[in-house]
Swiss-Prot record:
GO molecular function, one term: L-lactate dehydrogenase activity
Catalytic activity line of the entry: (S)-lactate + NAD(+) = pyruvate + NADH + H(+)
Residue ranges of coiled coil: none
Protein name (Swiss-Prot/TrEMBL): L-lactate dehydrogenase A chain
Chain's gene name: ldha
Pathway annotation from the record: Fermentation; pyruvate fermentation to lactate; (S)-lactate from pyruvate: step 1/1
Family affiliation: Belongs to the LDH/MDH superfamily. LDH family.
Biological processes per GO annotation: lactate metabolic process
Organism expressing this protein natively: Sphyraena idiastes (Pelican barracuda)
Binding site for substrate: R106, N138, R169, T248
InterPro entries attached to this UniProt entry: L-lactate/malate_DH, L-lactate_DH, L-lactate_DH_AS, Lactate/malate_DH_C, Lactate/malate_DH_N, Lactate_DH/Glyco_Ohase_4_C, NAD(P)-bd_dom_sf
EC nos: 1.1.1.27
CDD domains: LDH_1
């Protein structure tokens, strides 16, 4: 008899039932691993699968996480370059993609990422046809559109991480300015993730008190408190972090885990995430932009009708037109 047989007396033969809350992260770069760790530390899955084309790095990352298994409640952590390892995932988070090279045009970068997605997305669909697809790779709004087109999934099952992080940065900086915790500072950044994001100043409030009623010039020219600088700091924040440490990872990883939590726990929480906005706020083209959305078990169940000022709506439409200009040139 083996040591195991001497130690353990089997009462019944266990039937494998598979994972109920399996999450896959595609891409084990800085963002992928920060997302994976954040998901594990929040105890959001009973199985975590990692996929990447770089086999040695993937194997090392999986081993590193497995060695910390004692400190986690996720029983199974697996990884492979073969997508069969992702089978029956409930949520698949895509962080893989090409990095922008010096002097490279945005359109060229997007097309390179489209070519990568042409391999990734069909493999995800093959092994997890009922999953919720969350795109994190940049430019996130265009790549969410690409993932939606390539997957053939209904729009409620394809979500972009969008401005969930931009809004978190906004609330953090607002909190610093007011000496309050970010959770007590309410404000939304919508539209395109990044440079042309739109701060909804008309909705900024603390404890239901609209800050724009206290300071009617908030976010506009002539504001002596220069609240406009808060949004500039949100936009510049990522560039600043990249300049200092070479990449962004932790905040986007936590943001991804926040979104995954709302889905797997069916929280019906409202998040600013990238979804198909054609027909909303004057947008005429088939583009994905961030608006407040309800996330739950089925994915994106509802969109909140925002009351935007004409200037805010104009910025949103301008963002949509810019994205469509890039999208219509893509070869899918």
């Amino acid at each position: 008899m083996s040591t195991k047989e001497k130690l353990i007396n089997h009462v019944m033969k266990e039937e494998p039932i598979g994972s109920r809350n399996k999450v896959t992260v595609v891409g084990v770069g800085m963002v992928g691993m920060a997302s994976a760790v954040s998901i594990l530390l929040k105890d959001l899955c009973d199985e975590l699968a990692l996929v990447d084309v770089m086999e040695d790095k993937l194997k090392g990352e999986v081993m590193d996480l497995q060695h910390g298994g004692l400190f986690l409640k996720t029983h199974k952590i697996v990884g492979d370059k073969d997508y069969s390892v992702t089978a029956n995932s409930r949520v698949v988070v895509v962080t893989a993609g090409a990095r922008q090279q010096e002097g490279e045009s945005r359109l060229n970068l997007v097309q390179r990422n489209v070519n990568i997605f042409k391999f990734i997305i069909p493999n995800i669909v093959k092994y997890s046809p009922n999953c919720i697809l969350m795109v994190v790779s940049n430019p996130v709004d265009i790549l969410t559109y690409v993932a939606w087109k390539l997957s053939g999934f209904p729009r409620h099952r394809v979500i972009g991480s969008g401005t969930n992080l931009d809004s978190a940065r906004f609330r953090h900086i607002m909190g610093e300015k007011l000496h309050l915790h970010p959770s007590s500072c309410h404000g939304w950044i919508v539209g395109e993730h990044g440079d042309s994001s739109v701060p909804v100043w008309s909705g900024v409030n603390v404890a239901g008190v609209s800050l724009q009623t206290l300071n009617p010039k908030m976010g506009a020219e002539g504001d002596t408190e220069n609240w406009k600088a808060v949004h500039k700091m949100v936009v510049d924040g990522a560039y600043e972090v990249i300049k200092l440490k070479g990449y962004t990872s932790w905040a986007i990883g936590m943001s991804v885990a926040d979104l995954v939590e709302s889905i797997v726990k069916n929280l019906h929480k409202v998040h600013p995430v990238s979804t198909l906005v054609k027909g909303m706020h004057g947008v005429k083209d088939e583009v994905f932009l961030s608006v407040p959305c309800v996330l739950g078990n089925s994915g994106l169940t509802d969109v909140i009708h925002m009351t935007l000022k004409p200037e805010e709506e104009k910025q949103l439409v301008k963002s949509a037109e810019t994205l469509w200009g890039v999208q219509k040139e893509l070869t899918l």
